[in-house]
Swiss-Prot record:
UniProt protein name: F-box and leucine-rich repeat protein 13
Family: Belongs to the DRC6 family.
Native source organism of the sequence: Mus musculus
Alphabetized PROSITE patterns for the sequence: FBOX (PS50181)
Subunit structure: Component of the nexin-dynein regulatory complex (N-DRC). Directly interacts with SKP1 and CUL1. Interacts with TCTE1/DRC5.
Keyword Cytoplasm: yes
Keyword field: Cell projection, Cilium, Cytoplasm, Cytoskeleton, Flagellum, Leucine-rich repeat, Repeat, Ubl conjugation pathway
Gene symbol of the encoding locus: Fbxl13
């Protein structure tokens, strides 16, 4: 061993590089521990195992069986350090002695210090113990204080959060309570204001009713003038002639021809006021009953240079009287519709003397092809021509319009009731009316494709189908009025085609029973709904609330809406209708609207025309709730609502004083007391329908004559308690009257005593009847050019 320690560096390096000490250590340790019977085979087997495992991972106990390995680590790394140790691995004897000395001294010092503390007690042990106890007590107090502080801090944080939450809740409750108080005060003030207004209206109503009853106590002349009957208060004298001339003209423009004649007989001042030429630009003879032919001739001769518009609708004059029209050289508009005495000879005289006519209405007259030949010869500037229900001219007569200079400026031609139409010679026609022409088919639209049509009106045609609208957006891009009534061949596909018309403003699909929610959805999704101002879906019974919801979203400019007999509409649809602030007219007749729906509809305070006819769920409460907020209401139709009583008449008289048209037909509970209140308050009433009001008597005739001076149309059918004599007196006051004293028919829903009949039987017949008398809402777009003369 000593010789190996003193070996050369080369040999020592060889031993270190080839792992000779580790190999020897592992083999020798294995032999010493294992003690095999055949050491050589054991060494051979271990050498092969060492070669297989490699020398880098060789440990001293590699050749020892795991069960024989030592469990306690030795102080020395190897057993052979002393034998084969290297300089950097071996511990020198000097270092070993020094280490043992240090270790022994450390043990002695440690054990001696411990023995010293135990064996030699200190003199101030009690003070030390007291000091330790003080430290322990202080530590324990600190620990307790820390624990308590942590608990207190957590409680304080939680209390603060709870306080903040409570304060926020209290503030929210305070704001809510304050809002409730403010809202309650506002409601109370609004209720008080409304109650004050109602009381004021009721007091005025009672005062006016007293004056009214005072009037009834005086003798009344039915033949008197149209001026008001004097009341107990003295009238203030006022001379109308001191007004500015423009104001006088505006006042007299509202008078009829009969009133003008009456004014001319008041005094010389009034006679002078009506001698202004501008008052005689338009003369309407259709409102006059039993006027002498001499008066007509005299008037036309006197104002022949001022007359621009003449209306003879329904007048029965002799031919020589109509010849006087030829003296009106500046005449521009002439209406002779329904004049059975108007012949081709009359037309010859007019055409020779009035070449400047622009608007000519010859509907329902006996003209023939001779008149059709005169039109292009003399009326070169004719723009609007109505030949509705003139059945004595032929297709050849219609072709005369292109003769000579022709009526090339014609833009409106009404051929309603004319079964054959040829318009290929009139390319400038923009409006076609084919009402009462059931033989027109889809091919007619192809013939009209060369015309720039703006308006189309069809009615009662079963041959028109969806095919006519297939290319309507390309053929008629500027069309704005479509009137397709009772065309049962139209389906949802037609609405899909119509949705592309950007200029459409009026759409009337009355009695198109195959139209449903799907078609309307396609229509409202298109650009056509943006400009739409009037929509009529009467008797389209397949429609539901979803269509109305979509309608309220896509039609911001809609003014007139007719949903009559759409039986699936409920109060939900009414809520969306009430949100359409552009509406001024709505027809909900025959729907399921109830009192709640009428209350919702009362939010819309701009409606002027409302129709809820045949709505069996409506009572006095619903009408009262609506009328109290509808001060602008002008037209109200509550016909066939048999539950209504005089209470609604009183409500209408108090709150709806501007009403001009009222329909209470089929309301058997209305009495003379209600009509007395109506006559005392509603002085602007023009149209009144009381058909089927079996409790009304002759007293209402006197009331209406006194209170409703402007009444023009009165319907009193099935009023058994009104005598023919009273009705005859009233006929001389109004322009149009319908009267009979028969018992109400079964489809009114009640008998002659007002007792209800079988609901199913009466309701079915009433619904059938309502389809026959569908009332078209007023619209400027649907008005004929010469309707203003009618």
């Amino acid at each position: 061993m000593a010789s190996l320690r003193s070996a050369t560096p080369r040999l020592r390096s060889y031993f270190r590089d080839k792992y000779i000490p580790q190999i020897c250590e592992a083999l020798l340790c294995g032999l010493l521990v294992t003690c095999p019977e055949d050491p050589l085979k054991y060494l051979e087997h271990m050498i092969l195992a060492i070669i297989k495992r490699g020398l880098e991972n060789l440990l001293w106990d590699t050749c020892i069986h795991p069960s024989l390995k030592s469990r306690v680590r030795r102080l020395s790394e190897t057993y052979l350090d002393e034998l084969f140790g290297l300089d950097d691995q071996l511990v020198t004897p000097e270092l070993m002695i020094k280490a043992c000395t240090f270790y022994t001294g450390h043990l002695v010092k440690t054990h001696f210090s411990g023995w010293k503390k135990v064996a030699i007690p200190r003199a101030n042990q009690e003070e030390i113990m007291a000091e330790k106890m003080d430290k322990a007590i202080a530590h324990d107090n600190f620990r307790c204080q820390k624990y308590i502080f942590n608990r207190w801090f957590a409680y304080t944080v939680m209390s603060r959060e709870r306080l903040i939450t409570t304060l926020l809740r209290l503030r929210h409750l305070f704001y809510m309570q304050r809002q409730r108080i403010i809202l309650a005060k506002w409601k109370e003030r609004a209720r008080h204001k409304s109650k004050t207004r109602e009381d004021d209206l009721i007091s005025k109503h009672e005062l006016q009713l007293k004056k009214w009853k005072f009037k009834l106590g005086k003798p009344i002349s039915l033949e008197g003038s149209l001026s008001d009957i004097a009341v107990e208060n003295r009238r203030i004298a006022f001379d109308i002639s001191v007004l500015p001339e423009q104001a006088i003209l505006q006042i007299f423009l509202y008078l009829t021809f009969k009133d003008m004649m009456a004014c001319s007989r008041v005094n010389r001042s009034w006679m002078a006021m009506i001698q202004r030429g501008s008052l005689w630009n338009s003369i309407d003879f259709s409102t006059v009953k039993n006027i002498a032919d001499k008066c007509v001739v005299t008037t036309l001769q006197k104002w022949r240079l001022n007359v621009l518009r003449l209306n003879f609708r329904g007048c029965d004059f002799r031919t020589k009287t109509l010849k006087a029209v030829s003296h009106c050289k500046n005449l521009q508009e002439l209406n002779v519709s329904d004049c059975q005495s108007f012949t081709d000879e009359s037309m010859r005289h007019i055409s020779e003397g009035c070449p400047g006519v622009l608007y000519l209405n010859l509907s329902n007259t006996t003209i023939t092809n001779r008149t059709m030949r005169l039109l292009p010869r003399y009326f070169h500037n004719l723009q609007n021509l109505s030949l509705a229900y003139c059945r004595k001219f032929t297709d050849k007569g219609l072709q005369y319009l292109n003769l000579g200079n022709g009526c090339h400026k014609l833009i409106y031609l009404d051929l309603s009731g004319c079964t054959q139409v040829l318009v290929e010679k009139c390319p400038r026609i923009s409006s076609v009316v084919l009402i009462g022409s059931p033989h027109i088919s889809d091919s007619a639209f192809k013939a009209l494709s060369s015309c720039d049509l703006k308006k189309i009106r069809f009615e009662g045609n079963k041959r028109i189908s969806d095919a006519c609208f297939k290319s309507i957006d390309r053929n008629y891009p500027g069309i704005n009025h479509i009137y397709m009534v009772d065309c049962k061949g139209l389906t949802d596909s037609s609405l899909k085609s119509l949705s592309l018309l950007k200029q459409l403003t009026v759409l009337n699909l009355t009695n198109c029973i195959r139209i449903g929610d799907i078609g309307l959805k396609h229509f409202f999704d298109g650009p056509a709904s943006i400009r739409l101002r009037e929509l009529n879906l009467t008797n389209c019974s397949l429609l539901g609330d979803s269509s109305v919801i979509r309608l309220s979203e896509r039609c911001p400019n809609l003014h007139y809406l007719n949903l009559r007999n759409c039986e699936h509409l409920t109060d939900l649809a009414i809520e969306y209708i009430a949100s359409m602030l552009s509406l001024i007219s709505v027809d909900l007749s025959g729907t399921l609207i109830s009192n709640e729906g009428m209350t919702i509809l009362s939010r819309h305070r701009k409606l002027r025309e409302v129709s809820v006819s045949d709505c069996v769920n409506i009572t006095d409460f619903g009408i009262r709730a609506y009328c109290k907020t509808s001060l602008l209401l002008e037209h109200l139709d509550v016909s066939y609502c048999s539950q209504l009583t005089d209470d609604i008449i009183k409500t209408i008289a108090i709150f709806c004083t501007r009403i001009t048209s009222l329909n209470i037909a089929g309301c058997p509970k209305i009495t003379d007391a209600g009509m007395e209140i109506l006559s005392a308050r509603c002085h602007y009433l023009h149209i009144l329908d009381i058909s089927g009001c079996i409790q009304l008597t002759d007293q209402i005739i006197q009331d209406l004559q006194i209170g409703c001076k402007q009444l023009r149309i009165l319907k009193m059918q099935f009023c058994k308690s009104i005598s023919p004599a009273a009705a005859q007196k009233m006929s001389s006051v109004v322009q149009h009257q319908e009267y009979n004293s028969d018992n109400p028919p079964h489809w009114f829903g009640y008998d002659s005593e007002g007792n209800p009949l079988d609901k199913i039987h009466s309701r079915v017949q009433l619904r059938t009847y309502s389809k026959l008398i569908v009332k078209e809402p007023f619209s400027i777009d649907e008005e004929d050019p010469d309707s203003k003369h009618q």
